[in-house]
Amino acid sequence: NYSDNSSMREYISYQIMGEMGLDVPECAYSHITVNGEEWGLYLAVEPVDEVFLAAHFADVTGDLYKPEGKGGTGADLVYNGDDISAYTGLNLKTNLNRSDGKEILALMQALEDGEGLEEVLDVEKALKYIAANVALANFDSYLGNTTHNFYLYEENGRFTIIPWDMNLAFGGFGGGEVDIYEPTKQSMGGFGGGDKRKDTQDNNAVTNAAENTEAQADANNQPQPPDNADMQGMPSMDSGEKPLVTTLLENETYRSMYEGYLKEIVEKYFTQEYMTELVTKIHDLIAPYVQNDPTAFCTYEEFEQACSTDPTDQYSLVYYAVNMAESIENQLNGGEPTFNTSSMQGGGFGGGGKDGPDFGGEKPDMASRTEQTADAQQNAQQNDRPAPPDQNGGQQGGQMDENERSGQQGGQMDENERTGQADGRQ
């Protein structure tokens, strides 16, 4: 994924959310070649379409929305009257010529009034969605300034929220302390805060990205600064009115349910044991492909550090889980946030993926990559993991089975691999 040295933030996020009972897309790691050209490792993500809806809902004839907060209104689900045409950011995806929007208007009205919510909303899944995104510090979502990367599906007048695009989870969107009771007012350290561990700091990636046009950013499938960002792309601390969060958490019963879901995450998923086992399993699967990826966003050494199972390594997913669990538990017991996610920020707009924007800096040549591999092999041995193959050593011991492959024949990607999601790049 873009701006993810571990190449597994999105995969793990979907796995946790799926185990919690949310409707999440299927995903699988894929090694892609196109007409004989190596494109490297991707995460193929199932599109939210008719096939997805049929797998998760009994009725597939309802309205599907993909709200987008940038340049439109309504994505925040704030009620502003009954003129559906005024909600330009809702983005209806189905029933384009048949829907009058009365169901989504009823949802927004209920969120404003705080009454009859369970008639128009799957409250349980909405609370799980909020809890998971809070724990994952995934603020490139409904919770953050961008107010996007989610779907709403209506079945018989009742909406279910569907997660989408989790590559900036684990604090990748902006560092700061996460207040579980006011998550939309989280203190953020900036949009894509620059990689402290790379020489590419000097390439002024964020500055150049701010000068990039919106059209170029869209074309390159890169995240864009929120509408209220300053010239450096620094968002304000308050993501605005978010009734899906505030209305639910103001209700004592729903607030208690939300706390229960956070406790579930702390006790079941954000343990050192669970995260170590999951990270190690994924690492051992994808490491040879990451090491030989011609379009990698980071060095192999940085990948190894992000996958470290040392709970004191501040750049690792295990470190994040252990410390976020402690912070959540402290707040559930009446205390304050204790964890700042700044160390988990990705590399901002930079990264240099396939056909991505050129923000300066050079991709490591084969000699430097070989030197990095030698260092990474030593680190892998210290972590009791299989060392990666050398540049000429093939990919023995790390082969993917058919479920993990891309399903391509003759080097061609199928539609799911192309569409999945725009920034599904590993």
Model-derived features: positions:
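Soluble non-cytosolic domains of exported or imported proteins
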Residues: 3-11, 94-102, 121-126, 248-256, ...
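Short, solvent-exposed loop/turn and secondary-structure capping segments
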Residues: 9, 42-44, 53-58, 139, ...
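Histidine-centered catalytic/metal-binding microenvironments
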Residues: 287-352
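Active-site acidic catalytic loop and adjacent metal/ATP-binding pocket
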Residues: 118-172, 321
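Internal "kinase-insert"/substrate-recognition segments embedded within catalytic cores
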Residues: 1-2, 18-25, 37-136, 181-219, ...
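A conserved long alpha-helix in the C-terminal portion of kinase-like catalytic domains
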Residues: 187-195, 227-282
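Disordered, low-complexity segments in secreted/periplasmic proteins that are enriched in proline
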Residues: 173-240, 339-426
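Surface-exposed patches in mature extracellular/periplasmic domains of secreted proteins
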Residues: 24-31, 117-123, 141-142, 269-277
